[in-house]
Design a protein with these regions (language model features):
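Conserved hydrophobic helix-helix packing surfaces used for dimerization/oligomerization
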Residues: 3, 26, 120-122, 205
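FMN-binding flavodoxin-like domain, especially the glycine-rich phosphate-binding loop
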Residues: 39, 50-88, 93-95, 137-151, ...
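Active-site-proximal loop/helix segment associated with metal-binding centers of metalloenzymes
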Residues: 12, 32-67, 111-116
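Catalytic core of the metallo-beta-lactamase
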Residues: 1-47
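Short N-terminal or domain-adjacent regulatory/targeting segments
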Residues: 89-116, 190
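Short hydrophobic segments within beta-strands
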Residues: 29, 91, 123-125, 208
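Long, well-ordered mid-to-C-terminal structural blocks that present hydrophobic/aromatic surfaces
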Residues: 118-164
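A general structural motif
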Residues: 100-108, 134, 153-162, 184-191
Length: 249
């Protein structure tokens, strides 16, 4: 066998390299094309229902570990396109020997920060249940209008890695947060901070704020998105809830 070593900096370590077996076309891809999850007796991706059982973990792996370094992944994908690869052997997850284009296309989209699906991710924080009720009401209304690709998460009850992965998946994101000491609710701010550190971009945001007096969370979330997230649009129609949702808001 003849092998070639190719530098793949920041995918995801500075010194990362991949190894290409030119004899059989096997790419030992290190952290590239990896995923969370154990193999459970199946070695190859074509032996499992990857789209059903693995793609969510693959997305979560990429977005949280490599997501910040999209341009470096794009550079590696361009290198990979120039050689006849038959098989991916990543350090984490199953081996790919069929339908490589499917998996390459996923990584191409993730690394360009393009959404996979046109749909809505609703992330809410709620202290007394009122903001949660507002978020669920919105989700119901969206589904009634045919937007069935809608996911709703409590930011206080969901590990941020899952929220990041879902944010990379959907085209539209709604943030619903109460005002907390004239600021964004801490868990919601933490989610926004993670988006920033992972170079998240190219999404449309809607904002719902809640409070009894001196409501500030909406304007602060809008300011954060516009100043710290690239190429993101904040819809002008912002919803402001005074404690609990009603017909007027």
């Amino acid at each position: 066998h003849t092998v070639t070593f190719v530098a793949a900096p920041m995918v995801h370590w500075p010194e990362a390299m991949v190894t290409f077996d030119t004899t059989d076309g096997v790419l030992f891809s290190a952290d590239a094309f990896g995923t969370f999850g154990s193999l459970d007796g199946k070695l190859f991706a074509d032996e499992v229902d990857f789209d059903r059982d693995w793609i969510d973990d693959a997305r979560r792996y990429f977005c949280n570990i490599v997501g910040k370094y999209g341009p470096f992944v794009q550079h590696l994908l361009k290198k990979a396109a120039s050689v006849p690869i038959t098989t991916f052997c990543p350090l984490h997850g199953p081996v790919w020997r069929k339908d490589l284009k499917y998996y390459i296309d996923k990584h191409d989209k993730w690394s360009r920060y393009e959404p996979e699906e046109k749909g809505a991710l609703i992330v809410y924080a709620s202290m007394y249940g009122n903001t949660e009720k507002t978020a669920q009401t919105l989700a119901t209304a969206l589904c009634e209008r045919g937007i069935t690709k809608t996911a709703v998460y409590d930011v206080s009850d969901t590990d941020v890695s899952y929220l990041i992965a879902e944010a990379f998946k959907y085209s539209h994101i709604v943030l619903a947060s109460p005002t907390y000491n004239l600021n964004i609710y801490p868990k919601m701010y933490d989610f926004l901070h993670h988006l920033k550190t992972l170079n998240f971009q190219k999404r449309t945001f809607g904002i719902i704020e809640n409070g009894t007096w001196a409501i500030k969370s909406g304007s602060l979330m809008k300011e954060f998105i516009e100043e710290d997230l690239k190429e993101c649009l904040v819809l002008s129609a912002q919803v402001s809830v005074n404690s609990s949702p009603n017909e007027s808001n």
